[in-house]
Structures are given as C-alpha cells and as structure tokens.
UniProtKB/Swiss-Prot annotation:
The modification N6-(pyridoxal phosphate)lysine is found at residue 40. It is an enzyme of class 5 (isomerase). Gene3D superfamilies: Alanine racemase, Lyase, Ornithine Decarboxylase, Chain A, domain 1. It comes from Streptococcus thermophilus (strain CNRZ 1066). This is Alanine racemase.
C-alpha cells in the first residue's frame, strides 16, 4: 500500500521514548537477564526496521511473528539474533539457516514432517514452545518436550531455547498465571537436556511479576509506552507513549440546526454548529466504532459526529478554525491528551490493536 505523503495525516514515532522505556523496564528486572525486543506486526505499528535499528545496542535480540518479518530485518542490516515466535513449516528451514534466523518448534508433528522431507537441520537454531495453558501452540508435557529436543538435535539443530507464554499476566487475578508458571517451571526443571535460554516473561510479566523471570525476557508493548493491561493494573513506574497520531482540518463549515451529517444520516445538528472535516478514516485504521469519540483541536476535545468514512471523519468544533489547523487523534495538544488505551476503551478492544491497525496509508515520521 502506498503511504499518503501528500495529506496532513501522520503518525509521529519518538524513538528516544522507546529507548527510555527499555531502560526503565530493564532497570526493574534481575541483572544478567537477556532482553529481546518484540518488533512483530511492524513493531506494533511503529515501524520494525526503524525501531530495531534504533534500539539494536540496547537489546540482545529481536522477536517477530513470521519469516517475512525476520527477513525484513535481515535485509535492513539487522545482525542481532532474531527469533520467530510463530510456527514456520519445515520448508522454510533452508532460508532460516541461510539468514541465521531462529525458529520456534512447537510439536512432534513438525519434527516428523522435517524427517519425512529428509531435512538436515545443521545450522538451524530453534526454541521449543511449551503450551502451559494458553492453548495455541506448543508441546504440553515433559515427554514430548524431551523427545522433541532429542529429535531436533539428532537432525543437527541447535536447540538454544525453550519458552512459554502467559495468558493472564496482565490481570488482577493471578491464579492462572501461577498455574502456568508452576507447570512451565516444573517441566523445565525436569528436562533431560535443558536449553541455554529459558523465557516466559512478556511485557506484563516483566512489569508485575519481575521476580519470576528466567534468564531471558521478551519486551513487547511496554517498550512502546503502553500499559499491557489497559487500565486494569497500575504501572509501578512511568513509561512514555512513543506514537502520536495527527492530522489537520481540510474543510470547515457552519451548518444550521436540523442538518444531517455523514453516511446513514446518523447525526443531526441540534443548533447552528461548526463542522470540521479531517482526512483520516477506517482505511487508515481509525475505525467506524469511533463515532462519538473525540479529537483535540486547539487544546479542546471535539466530538466525532456522523459515521467514520473510509477516508474522512467529521468533528464538531467550538468555533471556526482556519484550514490546516493541527488536530490530534492520539497524543497531546494544548494541555489535553488522548491515549491509545482511551481509544481502545471506546472501541471495546485493547491498546495493542489500536496501534497495529494503523495502516500503511499513514506515513510514520521519526524523532
């Protein structure tokens, strides 16, 4: 998709904020723990290559979701270890070996398929995924983990790590978290051959359960300045949102009372109202359920009226403003602010999704 460079809609990414967030989290976890920055999904909408280049000296490696995301980093000159957290089928092994990319292996079925294809795994680095209660991917018992490690080594692979993922580390009720932690700890402690890297800590675990980390952590949404729990749990220290979303007024008009606005005529002016139009819509990731939310103009919260269109939204203004007046959709403006968590709560979702949905039509700039 082509970025819309010739309109005022822009996502501004503060790379120094990401660096400071990493420093903040790392200062609260045990020393000598390896840190992997999670830059999957285009670094949660922030720009994977730009983020990885900026923080490369602060972290020990990177985590991505799939082989294409890993290749993007390698082609951009990123040399640190890269771990793919999702499953890459065995036919991706030769490319992973060639580019020195670590794969997650999550089942004996994967091993059987590699054996059937006659693959030589010499030169492949892999991590075993354990399903400790998430229910997605991973082996579910000690026997399978032992057999998988042994089978991979027999084919020449370097089984560098073993890991799991917590489902509820960002919730007030930590009972399921404790069950998962106990399951994983017991499995790792009883392995016949324990890999060098053991990791279970995502952002939430690193924040609220820092004493339970093993020897490696995966830092995701927290480095971008977002609370992993939304507003459920308070952060024990400050982090800075790294992304702001801005645009500008492209049309301003005064409508009389009784005038309908937008698709479906879902909004009708109740008095003479000043309506401004902004060049952003659901094709940019500013979704239709944000009707009734607000933006910031001149330090004032202005409601989104009428339906969100594909390319435009309309807002009610307190007065007539000139064309080109800056508008903030996320971030700070004149003492007022809107956070990704507030946008998420309006939409009934999580702050992760708000940022990940910002499409490639929205250019990113970097400070």
């Amino acid at each position: 998709m082509i970025s819309s460079l010739h309109r005022p809609t822009l996502a501004k990414v503060d790379l120094s904020a990401i660096s400071e967030n990493i420093e903040q989290v790392v200062s609260h976890i045990p020393k000598q723990v390896q840190t992997f920055a999670v830059v999957k999904a285009n670094a949660y909408g922030h720009g994977a290559v730009e983020v990885a280049k900026h923080v490369s000296k602060q972290v020990d490696g990177f985590c991505v979701s799939n082989l294409d995301e890993a290749l993007e980093l390698r082609q951009a000159g990123i040399e640190q270890p890269i771990l793919i957290l999702g499953v890459v089928l065995p036919d991706g092994v030769p490319l992973a070996i060639q580019e020195n990319i670590s794969l997650t292996v999550a089942s004996l079925e994967w091993l059987a398929l590699a054996q059937k294809q006659g693959l030589d795994l010499t030169g492949l680095t892999c991590h075993i995924k354990v399903d400790s209660g998430m229910g997605r991917i991973g082996v579910r018992n000690l026997k399978d983990a032992d057999n998988l490690i042994a089978g991979l080594k027999a084919l020449g692979a370097d089984v560098e790590g073993i890991f799991t993922h917590f489902a509820t580390a960002d919730e007030a009720d930590d009972s399921k978290f404790k069950r998962q932690l106990s399951f994983f700890t017991d499995l790792v402690d009883n392995l016949t051959a324990r890999p060098r890297l053991v990791h279970a800590s995502n952002s939430a675990t690193s924040i609220w359960h820092a004493t339970t980390v093993f020897n490696t952590v995966r830092l995701g949404v927290v480095i971008y300045g977002l609370n992993p729990s939304g507003s459920v749990l308070e952060l024990p220290y400050n982090i800075q949102p790294a992304l702001s979303l801005e645009t500008a007024l492209i049309h301003v008009k005064t409508l009389p009372a009784g005038q309908e606005v937008g698709y479906g005529a879902t909004y009708t002016t109740t008095a003479e109202e000043v309506i401004g139009t902004l060049p952003i819509g659901y094709a940019d990731g500013w979704t239709r359920d944000l009707q009734g939310f607000h933006v910031i103009v001149d330090g004032q919260l202005c409601p989104i009226v009428g339906r969100v269109s594909m390319d435009q939204i309309t807002v009610r203004l307190p007065k007539v403003y000139p064309l080109g007046t800056p508008v903030t959709l996320m971030g700070e403006n004149g003492g007022a602010s809107i956070t990704a968590t507030e946008v998420a709560e309006k939409r009934g979702t999580i702050n992760y999704e708000v940022l990940c949905l910002l499409s490639d039509r929205v250019p990113r700039s970097y400070d």
